[in-house]
Amino acid sequence: MNDQTRAFLRERFRDYYSRSKVFVPPGLAQREWGFIFHEETVGVAMRRHKAFNSEGELADYLRSMPPAHAYHSAAYYRHPQAPTMQEKDWLGADLIFDLDADHLPGVKNMTYGEMLDNVKVEIIRLIDEFLIDDLGFREKDMDIVFSGGRGYHVHVRDERVRTLKSPERREIVDYLLGTGLEPDRMFIRTNQRIDTGTTSVAGVWLIRGFDSVPGGWDRRVARHIVEKLDQIGRLPDKDAKEALRAFSLESKDVKRILHVARDPASLQKIREKGLIELSGNLEGFFRSILAGTIDQFKVSLAGKTDEPVTADIKRLIRLPGSIHGGSSFRVTPLTRAQLESFNPLEDAIIFSDDPVRVLVTRPAVVEMKGKIYRVSEGVGRLPENVAMFLMCRGSADYEP
């Protein structure tokens, strides 16, 4: 990126901040702020340890020194402008969840639009199934944000979690990932005796904790068992038995499980009560089922494996309403209802369709506002929103 491109981007960002309001987080004066400027994007040097006392002070700063990227801390500090974490005096932090398309399976074969579609499905599942149903957070205690890049953030501002330290937040991460779920803790034998029609069997299996909460991993396991057995039950006998033998089952257990798989009433009991009307040694079957459940339902959180975003109590997160300097898209705050129909390639675009002259340095395919632009190297005119995207990505330079 050359100097005239940086100057052009800086002025277009300044114009945006002069006419638009950003989302000011609660406790503004207790937040640390950090910025990366257009002149510094090559080395990605962040200016941290800033503090603002009012919304007006923040707005003036954004207009006078328009950044490429703007961040605020998830944490609240007594002295947010202090140069060291110890001197800042940590008071608490929002609980942050960061889902990024880079962490989705099969992402290498997706277009940008497909990545955004898939990560939206994940963030909806995180909010509805895990944060609301399982953990009991209320929608009004969450701020949902499109990151402006490849994913979404959820800020949970429930005061019950504000003072949680990293180990407790790590436990929440582990829950979302299904870490620590083991078959011998999930499945228990009961003394219940059931009538199979031809005989009476004792020691059937039950999914532990099924009735304790309306959601939870126990019900996901039950759902997965029913789906798996229903699939197998629809196969011809030979194929069904072969599929069950893959679970290292004895012949007698294969026959029993196949009977359950083809009995709607038995599947209903698994789905509604967590009751698996089978006896015998089924540990291998349960281990495989549990692994499949975790793989299917776990949340793909962004962040390094040793320090995910959620567990990091001192992390900076993008300022909602700011511009993402790597895409030119708006970091867009959303309600849960708005998220349903939100399309980043339409709704997060803030620049115009007016033509801008650029030198394309790398060929690219750009999806924008319902159109696909196949851009070749060389000088040409493009809609401003496409040109801004390419310049922010380092694939084009401004040509006056």
Swiss-Prot record:
Organism: Methanocella arvoryzae (strain DSM 22066 / NBRC 105507 / MRE50)
Gene Ontology MF terms: DNA-directed RNA polymerase activity; metal ion binding
Pfam entry (one): DNA_primase_S
Cofactor(s) it depends on: Mg(2+); Mn(2+)
Cited PANTHER family: DNA PRIMASE SMALL SUBUNIT
Keywords: DNA replication, DNA-directed RNA polymerase, Magnesium, Manganese, Metal-binding, Nucleotidyltransferase, Primosome, Transcription, Transferase
Domain of life of the organism encoding this protein: Archaea
Enzyme class: transferase
SUPFAM superfamilies xrefs: Prim-pol domain
InterPro entries the UniProt entry points to: DNA_primase_S (IPR002755), DNA_primase_ssu_euk/arc (IPR014052), DNA_primase_ssu_PriS (IPR023639)
Job description of the protein: Catalytic subunit of DNA primase, an RNA polymerase that catalyzes the synthesis of short RNA molecules used as primers for DNA polymerase during DNA replication. The small subunit contains the primase catalytic core and has DNA synthesis activity on its own. Binding to the large subunit stabilizes and modulates the activity, increasing the rate of DNA synthesis while decreasing the length of the DNA fragments, and conferring RNA synthesis capability. The DNA polymerase activity may enable DNA primase to also catalyze primer extension after primer synthesis. May also play a role in DNA repair.
Record text on subunit structure and interactions: Heterodimer of a small subunit (PriS) and a large subunit (PriL).
Gene Ontology CC entries for this record: DNA-directed RNA polymerase complex; primosome complex
GO biological process terms, semicolon-separated: DNA replication, synthesis of primer
Record: active site: D98, D100, D306
EC assignment: 2.7.7.-
Family: Belongs to the eukaryotic-type primase small subunit family.
Name of the protein: DNA primase small subunit PriS
